[in-house]
A protein has these predicted regions:
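ABC ATPase nucleotide-binding domain signature region
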Residues: 1-81, 161-192, 252-320
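Hydrophobic anchor residue at the start of the ABC signature
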Residues: 6, 112-114, 141
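Conserved ABC ATPase signature
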Residues: 99-103, 107
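Walker B motif beta-strand of ABC-family P-loop ATPases
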Residues: 123-125
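Walker B catalytic motif
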Residues: 128-129, 136
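Helical segment within the ABC ATPase nucleotide-binding domain
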Residues: 138-151
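Conserved H-loop
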Residues: 152-158
């Protein structure tokens, strides 16, 4: 609905076209908002009097654009001698000598944030900065991003995690609309009010109902009263790599189970899933059961969605994490 597009315009990477499908430029934008703070901002942006740094949404494409170590990349884009600060603040010391292509999703995300922060900017924009991060890393990254804001610098963030949004921001703009068709940005509200407005689906000040029903978090009812059938189980096992070892205890999955696997990044959660699904060879037997596994990292190509899904149906163990 346009959140990333809006950030790209604020960053000066895209120019608004006002529905004419041709870029009209920031001067026209400034004229349309004459007498407002928006006019002052976009005039300064057009005159290059404001420096803006943007962390893009998709960090998985970084290895396609850059081949080298984390240290070399960050030192190349560092405009304010902040290398040591971002390495310490984002806990990147253990990966600074590694190649970009060898990083996990969470490590790539923090490197992308670091590459944005070392820019000499007045305004820092972060598009979904906590994707791929575990809970501990989300809190750490949020505190680091929040520390950037002072009397000379501002921060704007696109974030879907409402808890992190509450922790990170002072003001919130609610964006509503229809995916792929249009988007509307509300006026700014305090964070608490903005989050409640989003959950309610109704903008009182603008008298706009953008969702038919509110989002409510209900208490969970008690589960089963009868003992369900076992779907599958496994014994305790160990899986080792050259520099990493996963130790897993015995486990059982029953009908009607929804099981969460919770833990920090890089400690073997995906390996556990891959062993149980049969994608990694295991030295123990499990009850024969059909499994469907969505992997953590996706490789996009030009295959049509319908053809991809038709092909996936042909496999007993569907790999779609």
């Amino acid at each position: 609905i346009g959140k990333s597009t809006a950030l790209s315009i604020i960053a000066g990477e895209k120019q608004p076209n006002f529905g004419d499908h041709e870029a009209s430029g920031f001067q026209e934008l400034a004229q349309r908002y004459k007498g407002t703070e928006a006019q002052a901002f976009f005039t300064a942006l057009a005159d290059e009097e404001i420096n803006v740094a943007l962390k893009p949404q998709h960090v998985d494409v970084i290895p396609d654009a850059y081949d080298g170590t984390v240290k070399a990349l960050l030192q190349r884009v560092d405009e304010r001698d902040a290398y040591d600060t971002v390495i310490d603040g984002l806990s990147l010391g253990h990966v600074e000598s590694r190649n970009i292509d060898d990083l996990s999703g969470g490590e790539l995300q923090r490197v992308a944030i670091a590459a944005t922060v070392v820019k000499d900017a007045d305004l820092y924009l972060f598009d979904e900065p906590t994707s791929y991060l575990d809970i501990k890393q989300r809190v750490e990254v949020s505190a680091f991003i929040r520390s950037l804001a002072d009397e000379d610098h501002a921060v704007m963030v696109i974030e879907h995690d409402l808890i992190i949004l509450d922790y990170l921001t002072d003001l919130v703009n609610v964006v509503y609309g229809e995916s792929g068709a249009y988007g509307v940005v509300s006026m700014a509200e305090t964070t608490k009010k903005g989050i409640n407005t989003y959950l309610d689906g109704y903008l009182a000040e603008e008298n706009v109902q953008f969702r038919k029903s509110s989002i409510e978090f209900e208490e969970r009812s008690e589960k089963r009263y009868t003992k369900p059938d076992v779907i599958t189980s496994w014994p305790a096992f160990t899986h080792e790599y050259d520099t990493f070892s996963l130790e897993a205890g015995t486990g059982t999955i029953y009908e009607d189970d929804i099981i969460g696997v919770l833990g920090e990044n890089g400690i073997g959660k995906s390996t556990l899933m891959e062993v149980l699904s049969g994608e990694i060879a295991k030295d123990f037997d499990m009850d024969e059961v059909t499994m469907s596994h969505k992997p953590q990292h996706l490789d996009a190509d030009d295959t049509l969605v319908r053809l991809y899904l038709d092909g996936a149906k042909q496999h007993k163990h569907t790999v779609i994490d």
